[in-house]
Curated annotation (Swiss-Prot):
It comes from Caenorhabditis elegans. Residues 246-255 have a biased composition (Basic residues). GO terms for cellular component: extracellular space. Coiled coil: none annotated. Residues 43-244 form a propeptide. This is Protein dbl-1. Belongs to the TGF-beta family. Disruption phenotype: Reduced body size. Abnormalities in the male tail. Disrupted aversive learning.
Length: 365
């Protein structure tokens, strides 16, 4: 292995351990405030510190403030969440403006809320979903054409897809990925519909603007991946993905069946978002098995402790010079991601995969 490859590998491993240490510190603080008696002031301070730490881990500066009437997460977003598509971000937008004229509908979407990550995100897929209906019983053939405006100033529009309406279903998906070849904070689509077809007005709308009943029938779903060269992404294995889906549906704590031991090991720890009063914006999961690492790293080091050579040497030196050399620590050695479905500001529904959220194994380091 050459020096450049060795250096890259070391940096990636170090960053992964740093993320694991950060998560462990946050979880231990959460554990302390959950079970340690404190004064009211100390408890409030610790709670705020835990929330700030978790928000930073989630890439947020503040809890998304929800204003106006609440909205329900549509079924197609629940389906995406349960499918484990292995994408970093999925965002769901409703149009901010709908203009109808004799030719069709103009739909405008505000994407500026995602601007904080625009420099390191790459759109991999974008889908415009339309719920359509015929305004009379006569069935006429025709096409639905989707155009997007590349330049707001010149109003130049380009067709990106056309579809027959001979077999009109409740929802029709249009691939509009081509509209995201450049980064933008606002995007507009023109929908050219046959005379006997229109966008459905949803009766069960919980918001009342645009009119929002029609906006709910024209969501834009954008899939994107982080494109940072230095980012360490951990793809969930099939086994991990299956267990995560089961945990989502069951919502129960997983109890470790291993025998109690003082040696370094993974132990149960469940994070309940309701305890943080985040149930208003985190839709799923309600909580998750984060696990934690506890136990000692003695000398001689048992083989099952998954210790590095450095930890073995450090343990030996600690036994000889305990005042000078600290013992190795029991820390996460392998972690897995967690997908969270939450409501961002301005009613943008987000699914995001966060790395290093669940401890899979522990060892001495």
């Amino acid at each position: 292995m050459n020096d450049s490859v060795r250096t890259t590998t070391t940096i990636s491993s170090t960053k992964s351990l740093v993320h694991s240490f950060q998560l462990s510190a946050i979880l231990h603080l959460f554990l302390l405030i959950s079970f340690t008696p404190m004064s009211a002031a100390a408890d409030q301070h610790a709670s705020h510190a835990t929330r700030r730490g978790l928000l930073r881990k989630l890439g947020l500066e503040h809890v998304p403030v929800q204003t106006g009437p609440s909205i329900d997460v549509p079924q197609h977003m629940w389906d995406i969440y349960d499918d484990d598509n292995d994408v970093d971000w999925v965002r769901h937008y409703y149009p901010k403006e709908i203009i109808e004229d004799n030719e069709g509908f103009l739909l405008s979407y505000n994407l500026s809320l995602a601007a904080r990550n625009a420099h390191n995100e790459e759109v991999t897929k974008a889908t415009l979903k339309l719920r359509l209906r015929r305004n009379n019983k006569a069935r006429r053939s025709g096409n639905i054409s989707i155009y997007f405006f590349e330049d707001d100033i010149n109003n130049d529009r380009f067709q990106i897809e056309s579809r027959s309406v001979d077999n009109l279903t409740e929802w029709i998906d249009f691939d509009v990925t081509a509209a995201f070849l450049r980064r933008t904070n606002r995007i507009s689509f023109f929908i050219d519909l046959p005379e006997d077809v229109e966008i459905e007005e949803t009766q069960s709308s919980s918001l009342s603007s645009l009119p929002y009943a029609r906006a709910q029938s024209a969501p834009l779903i954008v899939f994107s991946d982080l494109s940072e060269p230095s980012s360490v992404r951990r793809k969930r294995s099939a086994q991990t993905g299956n267990s995560e889906r089961k945990n989502r549906k069951k919502g129960r704590k997983h109890h470790n069946t291993e025998a109690e031991s003082n040696l370094c090991r993974r132990t149960d720890f469940y994070v309940d978002f309701d305890d943080l009063n985040w149930q208003d914006w985190i839709m799923a999961p309600k909580g998750y098995d984060a696990y934690q690492c506890q136990g000692s790293c003695p000398n001689p080091m048992p083989a099952q402790l998954n210790a590095t050579n450095h930890a073995i040497i450090q343990s030996l030196l600690h036994s000889l010079r305990p005042d000078e050399v600290p013992p190795p620590c029991c820390v996460p050695t392998e972690t897995s991601p967690l997908s969270i479905l939450y409501m961002d500001v301005d009613k943008v529904i987000v699914i995001r995969e966060y790395a290093d959220m669940r401890v899979e194994s522990c060892g001495c380091r």
